[in-house]
């Protein structure tokens, strides 16, 4: 066969094979495009269904809130202490909408050391009795919370497994080990009946606050980000809400005794406050707890309260400041969860011109959703809220916003449920039997003890 003919034959064959390959590739590409189109279509359908479901849940939550008596709605803003350590007994009744002598139960209860028995069985029975009372009186369950930071600030010290202070954790454990530690603690908290932990402390430690924090901080800004995130995710993965504290910070003055006054340089504020809280806000913490401190930042001047006739023009503690709550925490840093005050009976407020009733009004207008009180009675503060709610449109709007945020939290963390058949918000199903929960508690405690035994932590 002549050379040119052979070359042409090879060229023809090559072109033929190339055509077949191109056709095959086009076919594969078309099939891939079709698969991708169908995948995107399915994803859009799922996303649409998810959005539709969220809209239904949101509408159902609004209806649920509207169905509540005013007494119960307004009470959602308060988190108070309670009597005893064995069986729940409410202490206050009020008249509401023609109904006489109705039990007044807050949105949440905080447990202190004297509320904690040294026997896990009694603690779990006590928390059960709180929920039983709410159910038997057709009330929304209050959330149950405590401080379990670690070290000396741990209401379950000696009952649950070892929980070292934050400083020790950052020095001795990796982030993965810290996540395991806090996960085991969360399982124990949940088994005993607690819904929310007022922890972790995510203040960056410096010379100005080291004496007050005393081991409660993870240390540097980097450590706060790494270990604060580990703690936050560990608790909330195990269905215990976490509350970051204290924003925007403290100094060496103990707010239980006096009013802290802080001044940040612009760079210091960005490094030690804004950046850590903004980053951690992306992990969707259930709450942030405000500090009772007068705070200013160089270049911004003294931050004054705004929109509060009774406090106009006065320097205001961060816990009562619309600037720090609405403008900075929510606006700039993007936080979407619950805002907690610190205890309004601390000397930082009470001895510096903000007695409880004035503090309650200021906190609500500033954007606080949960007013923390170490007292066991709150009828006086509740009556003030009721009076202002009925006569002040701005106050009413702030209360309505807070009530909805609290109820959304309760829905998200299982104190309320969305019934798909009736499309209504209903009380959560009863928790597992006490025996089963205690089995979880002791199992997690054993693992907790074994994990820290090599460090001499018991």
Q: What would you call each of these model-derived segments?
A:
Residues 131-161, 181-204, 224-249:
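Glycine-rich, aromatic-flanked loop segments that form ligand/cofactor-binding clefts
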Residues 83-87, 115-118, 148-153, 196, ...:
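Solvent-exposed loop/turn segments at secondary-structure junctions
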Residues 119-131, 135, 223-236, 240-398:
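Second-shell residues forming the walls of enzyme active-site clefts
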Residues 94-112, 184-196:
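Catalytic domains of carbohydrate-active enzymes, especially glycoside hydrolases
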Residues 4, 28-100, 321-324, 331-332, ...:
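Preference for extracellular/luminal or secreted protein segments
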Residues 4-15:
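Bacterial N-terminal signal peptides that target proteins for export
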Residues 75-82, 107-111, 142-148, 196-200, ...:
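Hydrophobic faces of well-ordered beta-strands that scaffold small-molecule active sites
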Residues 15-24:
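Bacterial N-terminal signal peptides
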